[in-house]
Amino acid sequence: MNAPPQKRVYPKLPVWIVEDHHEVVQHIYRAIGSRHIPMKGIKMVHLDSHPDLLIPVNMPADTVYDKETLLRELSIENWIMPMVYAGHVSHVAWLHPYWAQQIREGQHCMCVGKDSSTTTIRVTSKDDYFLSDALYVPLDHLEHPKELHLHVIRVDPVVSSQTTKLENGQSGAKIPKAAQTQDDMQSKADTPCTSSSQPPDGSAASGNISETAKKKADDGSTSYITDKLLAVIEQTDPFILDIDLDFFSCKNPFKDMFSQEEFTLLKELYSFSKPQQDPDEEELLECVERRTRQLEDLEAAFADLLEDDGQETVERLAANPGMKSLFRLVHSLKNRPSPPDYEMVHQAGLTCDNSELPHHISSDEEIQQMITAVQLFLETLPKPTIVTISRSSLDEYCPAEQVDSIQIRVLDILESLFGCLDVHRDYESIPAESTSHTA
């Protein structure tokens, strides 16, 4: 019997820093090709204010087998799932700051495969995050399904006084009351925050309500995060540590482009009508079909406006079902000094289904508290095989005036935990030589 191939080890921990998040994929593929991480069953710890788990809607599933074409097709919100369908990634722990909650807390098991009717990549999860983009299909509609185990884990800030408590073995940080808006508290009241195993054909949460209530108190603490991660990452596992710097401070860049009134109108146009609680397959498919038509109609409407946004065209489009708000929106946009960018308007609308993108510009103190939180749970994990970092500053998801400071602090904690780093600043106009990081 042939012995399994020897696992290769980097002399120093490689850290690839890119600007746009999907640019990390080429570096992950290179690590697969060099056999530093396995071809399949890859585990990823993903720190981000956004899940990045959407799917290129119209991309043929077989594109994943053509690396160069795939890299051209990917975008910042959809770079992980193609790697799942390709069979590379099987476990993702999405660690999100307390201000960002696009997917229910807990464990979700789903399948990612090729939709037999459209030949595109689709998913069996029934979570609103996927339903609102019309990405759900039943398991029996998928060819070559691959299982994805997704763990959604909240991270709360840790203040210096709590660091002392943690060193004495006490529980970690809780979300400060001042940071809990009424919407946040209602969301937590409505959302089960327990980690529960779920079947591959969906991701509906279940569990005893009283047990859920007891567990809520510890969500976000260092001990809670550590327990969840160590259930996924074993000491000998090669894994990817992926960090978007907007995890520490995050903007919704569309807030600078549109007024609150325009956002309200976009929400009316793009509002997602959820299925009833515990929907059957027929209701789910009707929901997906309805949402697909809605998004296609909106895309077509804004494409028409690119050609002609005169009064007659706007009135004709606004007369269609669900399009009433279009008239006021276009009127508001045309009152600006510069002509509307209707393609950008549509992109903004796609973020306004039932919730806006996360927006929390952190103070320097808040950034440090999140840095401390990350350091505390990372020190309990084995050393990652590779680290990928996205700056997300040119598209303004991470504030440009904060990104360099955050990057320095993140590199500092990585070096303090894992020793000398092999840092590649891939975002610079002239790529820097691979260098060891010094504080």
Swiss-Prot record:
Residue stretches in coiled coil: none
- Xref: InterPro entries: UPF0489 (IPR024131)
Q: Which domain of life is it from?
A: Eukaryota
Q: Which Pfam families match?
A: UPF0489
Query: Which parts of this chain are annotated as the region Disordered?
Result: 163-219
UniProt lists compositionally biased (Polar residues) regions at: 179-211
UniProt family annotation: Belongs to the UPF0489 family.
Q: What is this protein called?
A: UPF0489 protein C5orf22 homolog
